[in-house]
């Protein structure tokens, strides 16, 4: 990853506010997280490389596109798994792996456990 992308989309700002709201119940939180994940995935996938391919339509042969590389999703266990839905739904046959990390509460350093 070359840079941090700050998503300025109005819905992402709204959804983030809803996630931060202590009055959001579990169902609302989960649904809001799913919606935010679609926005994030759209931005993240905007740099996926494509290659041209031919496809036969019912009328004629035409040009189209195929994704060049397999998409591998690696959410960090606990926090990252809640954002998985939008990324999985938008990608064609993604591979899903996991990394487990928690933060040391005293040093604030990440510690891998899986």
Where are these regions (language model features)?
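PRPP-associated nucleotide enzymes
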Residues: 1-114
């Amino acid at each position: 990853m070359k840079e941090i992308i700050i998503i300025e989309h109005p819905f992402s700002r709204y959804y983030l506010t809803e996630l931060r709201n202590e009055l959001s119940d579990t169902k609302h939180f989960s649904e809001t997280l799913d919606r935010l994940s679609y926005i994030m995935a759209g931005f993240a996938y905007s740099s996926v490389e494509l290659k041209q391919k031919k496809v036969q339509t019912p009328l004629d042969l035409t040009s189209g596109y195929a994704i060049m590389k397999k998409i591998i999703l690696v959410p960090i266990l606990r926090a990252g798994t809640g954002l998985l839905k939008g990324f999985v739904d938008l990608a064609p046959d993604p591979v899903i792996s996991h990394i487990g990390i928690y933060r040391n509460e005293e040093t604030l350093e990440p510690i891998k456990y899986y």
